[in-house]
Amino acid sequence: MKKYGCLVCGYVYDPAKGDPDHGIAPGTAFEDLPADWVCPLCGVSKDEFEPL
């Protein structure tokens, strides 16, 4: 699974780690994140991420 980076703040979403602080389990692909998921650092939507 690919990592995705936030274009605004540089946060990297790593599917192997997920985002447990926001209810996203490890092993969750970026494409499978809920539509309302936002960057945990700066709050932008998934549209502001690109594959690394």
Curated annotation (Swiss-Prot):
Q: Which cofactors must be present for this protein to function?
A: Fe(3+)
Q: Domain Rubredoxin-like, which positions?
A: 1-52
Q: How is it modified after translation?
A: Observed in four forms, with and without iron, and with and without formylation at Met-1.
Textual note on the cofactor: Binds 1 Fe(3+) ion per subunit.
Residues bearing N-formylmethionine are 1
Q: Which keywords has UniProt assigned to this entry?
A: Electron transport, Formylation, Iron, Metal-binding, Transport
Domain of life, per lineage: Bacteria
PROSITE patterns, per this entry?
RUBREDOXIN, RUBREDOXIN_LIKE
Q: Which residues bind Fe cation?
A: 6, 9, 39, 42
Kindly list the biological process annotations in GO that this record carries: alkane catabolic process
Q: Which SUPFAM superfamilies match?
A: Rubredoxin-like
Q: Which InterPro entries match?
A: Rubredoxin, Rubredoxin-like_dom, Rubredoxin_dom, Rubredoxin_ET, Rubredoxin_Fe_BS
Q: Which GO molecular function terms does the record list? A: electron transfer activity; iron ion binding
Homology family:
Belongs to the rubredoxin family.
Function comment: Rubredoxin is a small nonheme, iron protein lacking acid-labile sulfide. Its single Fe, chelated to 4 Cys, functions as an electron acceptor and may also stabilize the conformation of the molecule.
Its name, as the record gives it, is Rubredoxin
What organism is the protein native to? Heliobacterium mobile
